[in-house]
Amino acid sequence: MAKKEGVKKMFDNIAPEYDKLNHILSLNIDKRWRKKAVRELADEPRPLKVLDVACGTGDFTIEIAQKVAHGSEVVGVDISDGMIAVGVEKLAKLGLDVNLEVADCESLPYDDNSFDRISVGFGVRNFEHLELGLSEMYRVLAPGGKLIILELSVPSNAFIRWCYKLYFLKILPFVGGLVSGNRGAYEYLPSSVLRFPGPDKFMPMLKDAGFETVEHRSLTFGICRMYIGKKSAV
């Protein structure tokens, strides 16, 4: 089975329990990271057109929609029907006018230069073809636009890294599997983080995709990183 199909099936299966487990297992630190990213994204008073890629159940999408200027348009896409279905229910309860769509990040169904901002919250490591996904996001980003990526990473500090791996490789799969009934999904999470390129390799990939200015910020001892890529205005 291709990675894309496996990831879709896995997230379809864990979608009903995903939100509850995600916040418990991350100790709610993920909320703090998202707030930082949203501040970076919603940095202009004008209405923005925003695409949230790999939106999952819509947590990041919702925060963005609540913070951007009035009149903005926010769209979320994910490959998992199950995750999108949960997100649609959440949006309906909140009364937010946000469109969630099932779509492949490697073949986005939008015209060139369509969005002022693009976000990816903890999903870029799930791309089957990372370079293609980055190129697609660059394609649909408008000139002068900004891409903000949040992604988990391995801390550089030896003690923090030891604690991190103990939690990620032992505790998380056990608890996640116990609650969701799908231990494999919570074994995939740490393995996908360990395989994902560090800043020294990922930043050049953003450059190769076309982003003119790229930077990254380390959050919470390097457990999470925020990557920012800007498309030339001309």
Tell me what each language-model feature is:
Residues 5, 150-205, 209, 215:
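C-terminal alpha-helical "lid/dimerization" subdomain adjacent to the S-adenosyl-L-methionine
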Residues 18, 118-119:
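Hydrophobic beta-strand segment of the Class I
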Residues 27-48, 63:
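Conserved alpha-helix/loop element of class I SAM-dependent methyltransferases that forms part
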Residues 49-107:
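Class I SAM-dependent methyltransferase SAM/SAH-binding core
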Residues 70-71, 141-146:
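Short glycine-dipeptide loop
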Residues 106-117:
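A short acidic, Gly/Pro-enriched loop at the edge of an enzyme's catalytic core
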Residues 131-143:
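A short glycine-rich, Lys/Arg-flanked "PGG" loop and its adjoining helix->strand segment in the class I
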Residues 209-234:
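Core SAM-dependent methyltransferase catalytic element
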